[in-house]
UniProtKB/Swiss-Prot annotation:
It comes from Fagopyrum esculentum subsp. ancestrale. GO terms for molecular function: structural constituent of ribosome. HAMAP family: Ribosomal_uS15_B (MF_01343_B). This is Small ribosomal subunit protein uS15c. The gene is rps15. It is found in: Plastid, Chloroplast.
Length: 83
């Protein structure tokens, strides 16, 4: 997935949308790695940490800009956070 298709020019590298996009890419890569290496516990821990970071960032983003949050989760094909 290309960053330019999800992130607009106004949103810089530090924006919440950009960070969520980066975490989502890392999560997908680690998930694919863990399908091959089921006993890689260090990577499992790293995946859980990244999932937590993304969840906190999505919670912040949903409070800040609900419309853009909905667009982002639809573009990235991820579920909404639980409330």
């Amino acid at each position: 997935m290309k960053k330019n298709s999800v992130i607009s020019q106004e949103e810089k590298k530090g924006s919440a949308a950009f960070q969520v996009f980066g975490f989502t890419n890392k999560i997908r890569r680690l998930s694919a790695h863990l399908e091959l290496h089921k006993k890689d516990y260090s990577s499992q821990r790293g995946l859980r940490k990244i999932l937590g970071k993304r969840q906190r960032l999505l919670a912040y983003f949903s409070k800040k800009n609900r419309v853009r949050y909905k667009e982002l989760i639809n573009q990235l094909n991820i579920r909404e956070i639980k409330r």
